[in-house]
Amino acid sequence: MSARVLMVQGCTSDAGKSTLVAALCRWLHRQGIAVAPFKPQNMALNSAVTVDGGEIGRAQALQAQACGLDPQTDFNPVLLKPNSDTGAQVIVHGQPVATLDAVGYHAYKATAFKAVLASHERLVERFDVVLVEGAGSPAEINLRANDIANMGYAEAVDCAVILVADIDRGGVFAHLVGTLALLSASERARVAGVVINRFRGDLALLQPGLEWLERETGKPVLGVLPYLHGLQLDAEDAVPRNAPQKPQSQLRVVVPVLPRISNHTDIDALLAHPQVDVRLIGPGQTPPPCDLILLPGSKSTRHDLQWLRTHGWDAAIARHLRYGGKLLGICGGLQMLGTHLHDPDGIEGAAGSSPGLGWLPLQTTLQPHKQLHRVHGRLLLGDAGVSGYEIHCGISSGAALARPLLQLDDGRTDGAISDDGQVLGTYVHGVFDHPQALAALLAWAGLAQAAPLDLAALREASLERLADAVHTHLDTAALTRLISREAACST
């Protein structure tokens, strides 16, 4: 029997689509329902490696966790990873197929939609319920033609839609009414109800507005979700705007916010740790004194390496190391730490070579075949367990690799430790997520007595809080009817 399909679309980007789908996934999973997440098309630089050796958006990996599933490529069949202001790497069913500009991708959409529908068909045959996340807003007029991410998908598979809006930003009624007004009649009929997200305050004061909204639009308000503080969930793309300041912390970490930063979820455990103060430094900001500089991943490593030089980071890093500070590079950050970075085929932009920062004796050549691995092993610094994933096109070689940072269970080694022990590099994302590895790396950086922190447990607790919020604040009877197809969409 085919699954029931329900889609969540948003009035804006960051309205709460990913979070609401994750919440609904865990709510259904707790009831013993076989549920799967799905996002037809995603644009994000934070990605995850699947059990079948592919790449999907991190939001869908988190939603899979909410369903009690390992991440699979069918959960996000089309992933766009921007590598310039006008172009993106196109990943279909987990594998890169092309790098296209906006015009090129528009022409490719018909092919991409076939991949979307193929994944959809497989999922509806395997699961009882498929919860679908839209992208951006369904009311983007310039993107309506050949849409595969929002109403184009919903109409093709004939599913109901919930529309979510973020009240914390202000203008929630304008967002909802305006979005509905810009939909076609058939699209509007698919919207079965609306959810208001991130509400703070007295719900009684909002009630007159909710009643007006239902009269004005003819759509039921399915609930108002409160602003949930302290959730530990993977960000899909945006770097945290307000990293919590911890003036009494015992370890200071500085991270440059690279223009093409990717998989910045690597710092989530550091952001959550009570003894670690993370400072995210953007253009025009001077790096403050710290114990550790962390160079994150990048989707355009040579471009971001030049950005570091332009903004004086090469001198800042040299000064930091001269005074005894520590330096860690992850994935693209590791490549930057070497002596040279070669891109002969233009994998990440214009073909060419760039000198590295020169803190590790290794060089990297970018190659068309992307390395995608989920890994487990030991951190040789402190002999701690570690797990994570690799997503990179670079192949590194050189003397630095004779002193690896990780011994992997598949027999490979990874990364490097400098001769003086001040500089580390690794291709493995998520290296801080394992409690043992986190403690060992914090000790290396200068925090000898680190409080234990289990990021996976924090994520699980956050998913449970989301499911509790659905149970408490949404009309679960109406949601059950929608999922069971006992109620037609409102008109």
Swiss-Prot record:
Pathway: Cofactor biosynthesis; adenosylcobalamin biosynthesis
GO annotation terms (biological process): cobalamin biosynthetic process
InterPro entries (UniProt xref): Class_I_gatase-like, CobQ/CobB/MinD/ParA_Nub-bd_dom, CobQ_GATase1, CobQ_N, CobQ_synth, GATase_3, P-loop_NTPase
Keyword Electron transport: no
Cited Pfam families: CbiA, GATase_3
Keyword Hydrolase appears in the UniProt entry: no
PROSITE patterns: GATASE_COBBQ
Source organism, top-level taxon: Bacteria
Catalytic residue positions: 331, 429
Keyword line: Cobalamin biosynthesis, Glutamine amidotransferase
Family of the protein in this entry: Belongs to the CobB/CobQ family. CobQ subfamily.
Protein function: Catalyzes amidations at positions B, D, E, and G on adenosylcobyrinic A,C-diamide. NH(2) groups are provided by glutamine, and one molecule of ATP is hydrogenolyzed for each amidation.
Protein name per Swiss-Prot or TrEMBL: Cobyric acid synthase
Species assigned in the record: Xanthomonas axonopodis pv. citri (strain 306)
Lineage: Bacteria, Pseudomonadati, Pseudomonadota, Gammaproteobacteria, Lysobacterales
